[in-house]
Structure formats: C-alpha cells, structure tokens
UniProtKB/Swiss-Prot annotation:
Gene name linked to the record: hisI
InterPro entries: PRA-CH, PRib_AMP_CycHydrolase_dom, PRib_AMP_CycHydrolase_sf
EC number: 3.5.4.19
Keyword RNA-binding: no
Protein name: Phosphoribosyl-AMP cyclohydrolase
Organism, as annotated: Methanococcus aeolicus (strain ATCC BAA-1280 / DSM 17508 / OCM 812 / Nankai-3)
Job description of the protein: Catalyzes the hydrolysis of the adenine ring of phosphoribosyl-AMP.
Lineage: Archaea, Methanobacteriati, Methanobacteriota, Methanomada group, Methanococci
Length: 130
C-alpha cells in the first residue's frame, strides 16, 4: 500500500506543540513492555512507514532522527495502532539492543515508590550486562 494512502487511512491528528504539528508515538516491544515515548511529525511518520524503522521528531534538536542512528539500537516496526482521538500512535517494534539513551532496555526505569515517595531505578543497565 502506498504511504499516502496508509496515512490517509490512519488519519492521524497532529497537534500544535511549540509551533510544530506533532503527535505522540509510543513504542512497545512484542512482549508489550513499554519502551519509550516521543514525538513524530508527518515527515517522521512517512519515513517510518517507508523504511519500516522508527523515526521520531526531536523537539530539542528540531529535526527528525532514526532511532538507533548512533547507537545501533534500532526499532523495526511490526504493528501500528491509533488511539481513539488519533493523536497518538502505538508502535509494536522489534527492539535491537535497548531503547533508552541511559542504557536501560526501557526508558521507563524510574519508579516512584508510593509508600516512601522515593524514586527507585528498576531494570538493569544494559551496558553493565555485556
């Protein structure tokens, strides 16, 4: 299916965030572990659909980036879901290596302990694993 037709069928709702038209992109692995969340603009979505690999829009660098372009920890797209408002997309990906730039498998490795209000780090630092 051509990319424009795929985008038309998805009908994503890009929101104005800091003067840019963006949507939320959530990446999970095939075991349903939440890996990360980031923004996408329309070009990042098109590039993701064209290549089959996750591309995001960096608000801090003001550019599109391919996940893993420096680390090699790429995300291959397996499935795509849109939420009911169509302003967020959920991508099921095959994660190579780890997702987090802090070297954890998931970016969600900080846990607030509700009993003592302390932040705990969960998961293993992947650099130390190898």
């Amino acid at each position: 299916m051509e990319i424009e037709k795929m985008i038309k069928q998805l009908n994503p709702k890009f929101r104005n965030i800091d003067g840019k038209k963006l949507l939320i992109a959530i990446a999970i692995d095939e075991d349903k572990t939440v890996l990360m969340t980031a923004f996408m603009d329309e070009e990042a979505l098109k590039t993701t659909l064209e290549t089959g690999y996750m591309h995001y829009y960096s608000t801090s660098r003001d550019k599109i980036w391919r996940k893993g372009e420096e680390s090699g920890n790429v995300q291959k797209v397996k499935e795509i879901y849109a939420d009911c408002d169509k302003d967020a997309l959920l991508f099921v990906v095959e994660q190579k290596g780890w997702a987090c730039h802090e070297n954890y498998y998931t970016c969600f490795h900080y846990k607030l302990n509700l009993k003592n209000n302390d932040i705990e780090i969960v998961g293993e630092n992947m650099v130390n694993k190898y």
